[in-house]
Amino acid sequence: IMQLTGNKTLQARLTIRVSKNTLSFSVVDREAEHQVIYEPYTVKSGVSMAANLRQAFKESDLLQRGYQKVRVYIDSPILLVPIEEFHEEDLGVLYQHAFAGHHSDAILYRVQPALNVVAVFPINKDFKMVVEDNFQDVRFTPIMQPMWHYLHQRSFTGIHRKLYAYFHDKKLDLFCFDKNRFKFFNSFNAAHAKDALYFILYVWKQLGLD
């Protein structure tokens, strides 16, 4: 049984989700009641997210299982660059022009071939180091990536163009596709429903949707 459990831990990929104020861990487990084990972590205010993660390794049941593979979903501002205009050596300068306040972060990117863009996003260097020190196989991914892929497939159903809204962490991500490309993508702070509604209607009108 111990050997079997060890093999499952080696094969499984843990998921870490991190935003400005939240941190959680999850893993697919076919023997669990809902086939997924989800563990939110209570973030200590006034302490860096890297320090919170270090402490979580001492407290979290999932982190203490010894997983070697992890995917980290990062909720940070995303810059989309068309594939044909992407040059890796320009990433830092390009991102700093678009978003201020990330000079001390590592700038990462993930190619989105189905959408012909590259998603560029930052991660705190200390947080990145804590992750890489504790896992052998690490994949950093923008939090919107699975949502983009799922809704891009959905966008081909029906004859009308669609505007998608994703609410999370007191924010609103709005995006629209035109075949295999983004027609629109932007993020808004929207702690209240009336703010979200305003942004949705504004973008709807801006895009000329019916």
Where would I find each of the regions flagged by the language model?
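Short, solvent-exposed secondary-structure boundary motifs
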Residues: M2-K8, F99-G101, H152-F156
